[in-house]
């Protein structure tokens, strides 16, 4: 490949540290697609003959068939997927294989391959996220009016509906989809034809290869084209944000499945047992999703540190761009699939959710709001009165709506029997009818919008 410049071959350790074929073999489909587009363009531009181009294309198809059936053989002497493919092509078709690399460098070749791979990865993630959103919306529609406690600081705060809670995750995933879509749009420029860094003297048609590979256009600066790994960082940053959202939902399932909470029962198919404690049903799938989020964030940090301070154009450091992306994608795909399965099959224990909502004085804010609306008391004063009522209820060991009217009047004489209409969890939830609030009608309206966007009937 480049031996003409050197008087001796690489040391064994150099061969090992230099080789990327053990991991970049995952790019074989993209590498062959890029090569076929490149040779078709070379023929059109009369840089290679039609006969040689046809032979090269046929040979590439044969190599692809071998890879699909047998996998990519790992030979450190061949260094990377590009040379492995070109080497096998030469074995199959002979001399014409040597013309494939005309007007191309491995710098623009790998930049193209990697963009194609990340684009495919984004499309795969998008399909998984749609399935997760469908699961969330479907379960939310079953529980649009099911009351549960809303929390702040993991303390009971105000009643909400389970449907409202699940739709919060739908919104998070919608933002994640938007981030991946933005990343896809930015990466969809083709660097092929930038060559090593300065472009090429051959009369190539970069627009042709860009179109053939499904890119919107060729990139506009050859130096940037071979140096750029923003698209990989964009993917990892979007993946990290998504993994944080999945981790939050996983954490809630873990907490909710514990005996003190008892809000959910995770199915056996997403749980494991204990080697010593026969009674255990451990939420291992959720815990692994939570754990994977840390590894995905680590992958993002790894590539950030690799790219920090690199001069233009290509440096060998950039060979380490692919392992963190591959690892993050594999972990993310597993996490999305596992979380979708859990959402689809988890059993929500509605009576326990309601019971928990009725504890912890979750309607205290409703008492304060009632004092503002009905008794025309400034909110800060109403807040103080309500705090006194909560302290009394806590001392007596009863809920706010179980305090006798005499006790409430003793706190403030402006309170009357009408206050009890505001103190039930159902009344509290129904009153939160502002746009985007937890009132069942609002939740159902947001569910209907989500179903329309996702193409869900009913």
UniProtKB/Swiss-Prot annotation:
Stretches assigned to coiled coil: none
Main location: cytoplasm
A single Gene Ontology CC term: cytosol
UniProt KW Glycoprotein keyword: no
Annotated gene: argH
Reaction it catalyzes: 2-(N(omega)-L-arginino)succinate = fumarate + L-arginine
UniProt family annotation: Belongs to the lyase 1 family. Argininosuccinate lyase subfamily.
Keywords: Amino-acid biosynthesis, Arginine biosynthesis, Cytoplasm, Lyase
A biological-process GO annotation: L-arginine biosynthetic process
Protein name stated in the entry: Argininosuccinate lyase
Signal peptide boundaries: none
Keyword Nucleus on entry: no
């Amino acid at each position: 490949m480049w031996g003409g410049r050197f008087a001796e071959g690489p040391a064994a350790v150099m061969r090992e540290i230099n080789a990327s074929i053990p991991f970049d073999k995952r790019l074989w489909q993209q590498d062959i697609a890029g090569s076929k587009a490149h040779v078709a363009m070379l023929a059109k531009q009369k840089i290679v003959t039609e006969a040689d181009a046809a032979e090269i294309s046929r040979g590439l198809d044969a190599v692809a068939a071998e890879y699909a059936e047998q996998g990519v053989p790992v030979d450190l002497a061949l260094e990377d997927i590009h040379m492995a493919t070109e080497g096998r092509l030469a074995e199959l078709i002979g001399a014409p294989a040597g013309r494939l690399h005309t007007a191309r460098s491995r710098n623009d070749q790998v930049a193209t391959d990697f963009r194609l791979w990340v684009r495919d990865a984004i499309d795969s993630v998008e399909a998984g996220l749609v399935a997760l959103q469908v699961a969330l919306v479907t379960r939310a529609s079953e529980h649009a009016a099911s009351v549960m406690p809303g929390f702040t600081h993991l303390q009971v705060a105000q009643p909400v509906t389970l449907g409202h809670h699940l739709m919060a995750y739908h919104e998070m995933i919608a933002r994640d989809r938007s981030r991946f879509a933005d990343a896809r749009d930015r990466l969809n420029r083709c660097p092929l034809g930038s060559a090593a860094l300065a472009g090429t003297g051959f009369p190539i048609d970069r627009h042709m290869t860009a179109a053939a590979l499904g890119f919107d256009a060729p990139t506009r600066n050859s130096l940037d084209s071979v140096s750029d790994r923003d698209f990989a960082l964009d993917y990892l940053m979007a993946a990290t944000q998504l993994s944080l959202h999945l981790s939050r939902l996983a954490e809630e399932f873990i907490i909710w499945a514990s005996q003190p909470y008892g809000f959910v029962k995770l199915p056996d198919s997403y749980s494991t047992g204990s080697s010593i404690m026969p009674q255990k049903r451990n939420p291992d799938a959720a815990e692994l999703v939570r754990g994977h989020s840390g590894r995905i964030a680590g992958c993002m940090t790894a590539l950030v540190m690799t790219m920090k301070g690199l001069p233009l154009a290509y440096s060998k450091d950039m060979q380490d761009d692919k392992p963190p992306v591959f690892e993050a994608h594999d972990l993310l795909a597993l996490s999305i699939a596992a979380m979708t399965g859990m959402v689809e099959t988890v059993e929500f224990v509605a009576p326990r959710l309601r019971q928990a909502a009725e504890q912890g004085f979750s309607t205290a804010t409703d008492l304060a709001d009632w004092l503002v609306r009905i008794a025309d008391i400034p909110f800060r004063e109403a807040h103080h009165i309500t705090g006194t009522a909560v302290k009394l209820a806590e001392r007596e060991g009863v809920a706010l709506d179980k305090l006798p009217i005499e006790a409430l009047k003793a706190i403030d004489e402006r309170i009357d029997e009408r206050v009890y209409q505001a103190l039930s969890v159902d009344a509290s939830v129904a009153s939160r009818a502002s746009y985007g609030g937890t009132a069942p009608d609002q939740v159902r309206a947001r569910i209907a919008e989500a179903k329309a966007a996702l193409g869900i009937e009913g």
